A protein has these predicted regions:
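Alpha-helical structural motif
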Residues: 22, 117-121, 182
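Residues that form generic nucleotide/phosphate-binding pockets
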Residues: 25-29, 121-124, 128, 189, ...
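Charge-rich, low-complexity amphipathic helices
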Residues: 49-52, 117, 174-178
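Cysteine protease-like catalytic core of ubiquitin/ubiquitin-like
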Residues: 65-168
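Cysteine protease catalytic domains with a Cys-His-Asp triad
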Residues: 1-93, 99-104
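Contiguous terminal or domain-adjacent regions
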Residues: 158-194
């Protein structure tokens, strides 16, 4: 079982998840799944050069699919915030790359249109795959699942966990409504709220 991540009782059960909250959960899954790697959470403008030629999020800016394959990483989860690095943050979305299934999956719990930044990253991965003889299918969800305001981070975590299990396709995952209450229950399990 994953270590519970209780916040000394200070965090409310429906408070918006921070990047640190998401990172702590995903790093535990990384430790338990040697074929999985997590990147992020990253601001949407991951490839903007900020200083000395460095990008906002170097792992994404310098992403190299071949290096992941060499390290036997076949599943990669990425969480993005839809705000740029110089803003507070507004909404979490996720991308999952399954090299064995040859799929790149984009999940937004609101079912909104994909950002040009994430689309550009997915195209970059697709081109790298083609050079390695891997034809990726890029699929985006269009269905809205979230109707409350605080659970987008939990939806991202849940999406990555479910895709990592590899028991259902992306289409199967997104076809049935995933209610906010399910995310609240998962939050209580992962973060041990009273």
């Amino acid at each position: 079982m994953l270590q519970n991540l209780r916040k000394n009782g200070k965090k409310k059960p429906n408070e918006w998840l921070t990047s640190v909250d998401i990172l702590k959960v995903m790093k535990q899954f990384e430790k338990k799944n040697t074929d999985f790697e997590f990147i992020g959470p990253s601001p949407i403008d991951y490839d903007k050069h900020i200083s000395y030629g460095e990008c906002v999020w170097e792992e994404l800016c310098k992403f190299n699919l071949e290096n992941y394959i060499k390290r036997r990483i076949t599943k990669i989860g990425v969480v993005f915030n839809t705000d740029p690095h110089d803003q507070e943050g507004s909404h979490w979305v996720a991308l999952f790359i399954n090299i064995k299934r040859r799929g790149i999956y984009y999940f937004d719990s609101y079912g909104e249109r994909i950002s040009k930044f994430i689309n550009r990253f997915a195209k970059k991965v697709t081109k790298q795959g083609q050079r390695l003889g891997i034809e990726f299918e890029f699929i985006k969800n269009k269905r809205r699942h979230q109707y409350k305001t605080s659970e987008c981070g939990m939806y991202c975590i849940y999406f990555i966990i479910e895709m990592m299990k590899d028991k259902q396709t992306f289409q199967e995952f997104t076809q049935t409504l995933i209610p906010d209450d399910k995310m609240l229950k998962l939050r209580r399990q992962l973060f041990n709220y009273m």
